[in-house]
Curated annotation (Swiss-Prot):
Organism the protein comes from: Opitutus terrae (strain DSM 11246 / JCM 15787 / PB90-1)
Keywords: ATP-binding, Magnesium, Nucleotide-binding, Transferase, tRNA processing
UniProt protein name: tRNA dimethylallyltransferase
Enzyme class (EC, first level): transferase
Pfam family, one: IPPT
Amino acid sequence: MNAASTDKPRLRVLAGCTAVGKTEWALRWAEAHNAEIVSCDSLLFYRGMDIGTAKPTAGELARVPHHLVDVCDVREAMNIAGYVAAARRALTEIAARGREALVVGGSGFYLKAFFGPVADDVEVSAAVRAEVAALTPAAAVERLRQLNPPGLGALDTANPRRVVRALERCLASGRTLAELSAAFARQPGPFADWDARLTVLDRDPVELNQRIAARVAAMLAAGLVDEVKRLLPAGLKENPSAARAIGYREVIDLLEGRLPAASLAAEIEKNTRALVKKQRTWFRTQLPDHRRVDAAVLRDAGGLFDF
């Protein structure tokens, strides 16, 4: 966790897994503290992805100013660099208005950016990308080993995407993985100018599973299938991150004949539970020390943060 600092603007970050209840508690806290909300949900960026993302309703958005919601067409993929730039702009503008900022979301990699570096400064040329792309997976691993005589450390060589990324950066920088890792650790995070503190909202797993089931039923009743039908001609499948999102990918499978209608709700529930498990692990292992709050026993939004 960032050390407390009196010369940095305070930044509160509220994280939590899917269906835990972040939206309502964030709204209550923001209303009580004259704050504005900066979304840290990788799917709320996209216009039209409303039902399947449990996007705040028009009424909820009207209660508190929100940032980074509905900022991209569905075919325009957001990435970490774009998110960081947009979030920094939003935070700077909020501070200039003399208001508090509350970052809210469950997208682990984006959340991590508020507490440390998430991207290195290595620029990979098109020529290097083409050179690596021409290699078979086995050849890529072998080339990477040649460039790293001390070894590959904890790199998962069975993951082609990670091997490609590592090899591209070694070739582009002329450095070993160990050297790149050491340089990365010395980088300041993109939000080092803020004193960020984290609270993770959680619930008992049995209760959370019940909320997931209710949420899926409500989404289907609200017209999730029709939402996906509208988004497909708008370019949903051109954006893999959006098309693979839980709720959307299952409906796509339904519409393309790979999933029977009778199995739709159960499939979305199953995949949501798996996502929640991954989110919990990420929050525990990848985010800094934080305060954990049980949403089921929380009575006042003031109890979310201790500073």
